[in-house]
Amino acid sequence: MQATNPIWAEVQQLLQKNLSKPSFETWIRPAKFNCFENGLLTLITPNNFTSDWLRKNYSETIEKAAEEICGHNVKVIFKSENNVNNNSNIPDTVSQQSIKSQTRSISTSQGNNTNNRTKKSHSLNIRYVFKRFVVGPNSRMAHAAALAVAESPGREFNPLFICGGVGLGKTHLMQAIGHYRVEIDPEAKVLYVSTETFSSDLIQSIRKDGMHVFKNKYRSVDLLLIDDIQFLEGKEYTQEEFFNTFNALYEAGKQIVIASDRPPSQIPKLQERLISRFSMGLIADIQPPDIETRMAILQKKAEQERMNLPRDLVQFIAGRFSSNIRELEGAFTRAVAFASITGLPMTVQSIAPMLDPNSVGVVVTPKQVIKKVSDFFSVTAEELVSSSRRKPVSQARQIGMYLMRQGTNLSLPKIGDEFGGKDHTTVMYAIEQVEKKLSSDPNVASQVQKIKDLLQIDSRKNL
């Protein structure tokens, strides 16, 4: 590994100007240059978690900075020191943006040459495969049905309708079916889309007089995987076109897999004929996992990250987060990040305070909240406490008020004072807005959690 490299040094300088100091010091500075060949920049990170975090949150930012320095396209790969030192055969953590770019180019090629069946039209998450799905009593039937459909599509269970609450594994099973089919038959045309994408494609095709393109995209596939079908609610024209698409595929013997947060009969304003179609195959529901399954999920996640979690910590996390798998895995990720950055051991005693789902996890000062929020959103502290109604500022201010309410003992009027003398009703409204968005907007939920993590790390360092 090379100690220094002029290109990476320049990229770091550019990133330091564009990122907040905590973000740069925590994530970018520890990354070490490895090599730069044929437009591929390889960086070494302290551990697998840091590689994964950089890939998810900073790969595109690093690539853009590198492209600005080099003057041509750059892709970034992250390797952990453990994998490098152990000559591990684990695949490199490749930029998600690179994967997305490849998917976009494949989809474009598919649209331009629909007769070339070796060019796939799917857009599947590489992690959502059967071997990574932990089967429990809550999901055994859905898993068995998904595997049966993957092995023999268009036969017994057509359509396969998978239903269950948020974050229980519906999307994972759907995409696992797609991966399985592509692995068995590389020429299979597999398409995974959300209902919102289906509706958006339909609207665009109408505007551009391109219904033939739309029909070709959706009716020429061998396997259609459509997520969040509950969003068909009240969309009459979209329901009409989906009904026609469904019939065309079904009559051609093609497999249809549908996912929803509820059974067909419970989706409001859904046409009876669609309810009938959705119910004619198999409806398989997924329930929240029991504690044994949750512990197995955490242990599998730890194995994938090559970590050895104490059993009492696994049991603690599994007992604390019971509503869905996404929340459970998020808790694991936060715990690993916290231990990695602070250097504290992975024990219940050190991890428990920052895993409280209803609080910041530590007591913080108003100044800490304002600094972390302003740094995170790249606004000044003065703007944050001002009366500015610019959207970026007002959104940051609402999140700041929410975090201050959770992390301090201040009353609503006192929080208002910290934000430039705002009325307590303004603070109450801001908190309510953030609470609503936490359950409906993944981006806001991610932003809030990242700032919580930064506050926890900052407070621990000052202990």
UniProtKB/Swiss-Prot annotation:
Lineage: Bacteria, Bacillati, Cyanobacteriota, Cyanophyceae, Synechococcales
Source species, domain of life: Bacteria
Known role: Plays an essential role in the initiation and regulation of chromosomal replication. ATP-DnaA binds to the origin of replication (oriC) to initiate formation of the DNA replication initiation complex once per cell cycle. Binds the DnaA box (a 9 base pair repeat at the origin) and separates the double-stranded (ds)DNA. Forms a right-handed helical filament on oriC DNA; dsDNA binds to the exterior of the filament while single-stranded (ss)DNA is stabiized in the filament's interior.
Entry GO CC: cytoplasm; plasma membrane
Stretches for region Domain IV, binds dsDNA: 340-463
GO biological process: DNA replication initiation; regulation of DNA replication
Annotated protein name in UniProt: Chromosomal replication initiator protein DnaA
UniProt-annotated stretches for the region Domain II: 79-122
Region (Domain I, interacts with DnaA modulators): 1-79
Signal among keywords: no
Domain notes: Domain I is involved in oligomerization and binding regulators, domain II is flexibile and of varying length in different bacteria, domain III forms the AAA+ region, while domain IV binds dsDNA.
Gene3D superfamilies in alphabetical order: 1.10.1750.10, 1.10.8.60, 3.30.300.180, P-loop containing nucleotide triphosphate hydrolases
Similarity field: Belongs to the DnaA family.
Binding partners and assembly: Oligomerizes as a right-handed, spiral filament on DNA at oriC.
Residues covered by region (Disordered): 87-118
Region Domain III, AAA+ region, annotated ranges: 123-339
Binding site for ATP: 167, 169-171
